[in-house]
Regions:
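Non-catalytic substrate-recognition/targeting regions of SAM-dependent transferases
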Residues: 48, 53-55, 85-153, 161
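A short interface-forming secondary-structure element
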Residues: 67-84
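Residues at the N-termini of beta-strands
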Residues: 39, 104-106, 193
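Conserved SAM/SAH cofactor-binding pocket of Class I
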Residues: 165-210
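Short, surface-exposed beta-strand-loop junctions and turns on beta-sheet-rich folds
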Residues: 60-61, 75-78, 148
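Non-catalytic accessory regions of SAM-dependent methyltransferases
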Residues: 1-70
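Conserved alpha-helix/loop element of class I SAM-dependent methyltransferases that forms part
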Residues: 154-170
Length: 210
């Protein structure tokens, strides 16, 4: 029903990516509304040539028209022509906000290329965009810009849900806990106690805020 957008793509196959994204986004939006989830993954390398993960997050106020995209590119193998991979990724960045109805300046992109030192830690040259998201009645803090990961692994949602269902009356030990989201689910599920352990004080402080 809205205005028609024309996006000039660099690779002809990018039209297939757009069609796939449109289909999966429609399904996931329905699912998110039904489950009461405000952040969710709409695409995860569904097409091998477009190896990106695209997540939808709410902005401040959780308004429908105030959405943000977090797009993470999986580093292409050395057998792929770097120029072709870059053109595909440029097409993803151009098409995704149009297909999903998100403002271009609300798109944050990263490349998932782990350094030996652990590039999940904060790059001091990056700014932050911190907001809160809702999952199963709990609020979690996420940073869409400052780190490689946002603070909440969306593909672990079912595991967190399972923890919450089985936690009642138990003592819950969360090792390599990251930002402690599983501990929140355990506490909410009636755990007798929770212990949250991580090597990073930054993430432990984040877990405490959650």
């Amino acid at each position: 029903g809205g205005a028609e957008h024309v996006v000039e793509v660099l690779e002809p196959t990018s039209e297939q990516f757009a069609a796939r994204l449109r289909k999966t986004a429609k399904e996931r939006r329905k699912w998110a509304r039904r489950e009461g989830v405000s952040c969710y993954r709409v695409y995860d390398a569904d097409l091998p040539d477009y190896a990106v993960a695209i997540d939808v997050y709410p902005g401040a106020g959780d308004a429908e028209g105030n959405l943000y995209l977090h797009i993470a590119e999986y580093a292409a193998p050395s057998t792929i022509d770097p120029g072709k991979a870059q053109r595909r990724y440029d097409d993803v960045l151009a098409l995704a906000p149009v297909v999903l109805g998100v403002r271009p300046d609300h798109v944050f992109s990263k490349v998932r290329r782990r350094d030996k030192g652990g590039s999940q830690y904060r790059d001091s040259s990056r700014r932050s965009y911190v907001t809160q998201v809702r999952e199963d009645g709990y609020l979690f803090e996420v940073d869409l810009v400052g780190y490689l990961d946002t603070g909440l692994f969306l593909d672990h949602r079912l595991t967190r849900e399972l923890v919450g269902k089985k936690a009642e009356g138990k003592r819950f030990l969360n090792l390599f806990a990251y930002t402690g989201s599983a501990s929140v689910h355990a506490a909410g599920g009636g755990a007798k106690s929770t212990a949250t352990v991580d090597l990073s004080q930054t993430y432990l402080d984040w877990a405490a805020r959650n």
